[in-house]
């Protein structure tokens, strides 16, 4: 019994010590200490994390990659994420995150990949998204996002893959979608989009995958897919 007691005390003291970070030099995230200046990559994917994303994550300003995917994180994406100006990759998919996408996401001007899919995010896409001029992958599918698709999305001219499927977006596809001339894949299916599919999609001469089904478009039969010869896989009707 005494041996077990000593082991328990050792475990308690080691746990307390490991979670005691050096003030102004380290931050505590999920019981681990991370150097403020020397943490460049944070990968805790599939670690069974719960609760909210700590606000302190915004202090790790040298991060270029965050992967918190495949956990059970809840609550809102903290606005402090916008402090991470060097971030190239942000993977938050497959969690239970809710609330709106923070406008501060537009501060991440070096971002290459933004994966927020398979969460419970609501509200609209912030117009500050237009600041992400280097963005190549934008995955927002399987959320509760609503409102119209902002015309500002057409300013992301380096986008390679855009997936907004399985949300509650309404209104028309913005004409500016035709500006995305580097787009390889466009997935907008399972939404409440209506009106006409803009003929500007004919400008997407590199697109190979186009999925627009399960919406309420009015001019589906007038779309001439032969004008987009790059297409490999397409579905625009239910």
Regions found by a protein language model. Give the residues of each.
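Leucine-rich solenoid repeat scaffolds
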Residues: 21, 194-238
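Short, conserved structural micro-motifs that define repeat-unit consensus positions
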Residues: 43-48, 74-77, 125, 139-142
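Leucine-rich repeat
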Residues: 36, 59-63, 82-87, 106-111, ...
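Conserved hydrophobic beta-strand positions in leucine-rich repeat
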Residues: 40-44, 64-68, 88-92, 111-116, ...
């Amino acid at each position: 019994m005494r041996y077990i007691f000593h082991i328990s005390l050792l475990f308690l003291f080691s746990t307390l010590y490991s979670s005691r970070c050096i003030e102004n030099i380290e931050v505590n995230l999920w019981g681990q200490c991370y150097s403020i200046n020397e943490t460049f990559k944070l990968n805790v994917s599939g670690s069974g994390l719960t609760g909210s994303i700590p606000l302190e994550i915004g202090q790790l300003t040298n991060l270029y990659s965050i992967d918190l995917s495949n956990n059970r994180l809840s609550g809102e994406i903290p606005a402090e994420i916008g402090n991470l100006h060097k971030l190239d990759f942000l993977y938050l998919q497959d969690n239970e995150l809710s609330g709106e996408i923070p406008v501060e996401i537009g501060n991440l001007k070096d971002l290459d990949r933004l994966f927020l899919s398979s969460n419970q995010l609501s509200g609209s896409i912030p117009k500050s998204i237009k600041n992400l001029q280097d963005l190549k992958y934008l995955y927002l599918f399987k959320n509760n996002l609503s409102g119209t698709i902002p015309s500002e999305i057409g300013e992301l001219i380096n986008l390679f893959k855009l997936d907004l499927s399985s949300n509650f977006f309404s209104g028309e596809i913005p004409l500016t979608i035709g500006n995305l001339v580097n787009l390889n894949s466009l997935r907008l299916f399972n939404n409440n989009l209506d009106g006409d599919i803009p003929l500007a999609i004919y400008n997407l001469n590199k697109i190979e995958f186009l999925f627009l089904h399960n919406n309420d478009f009015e001019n589906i039969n007038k779309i001439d897919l032969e004008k987009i010869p790059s297409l490999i896989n397409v579905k625009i009707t239910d």
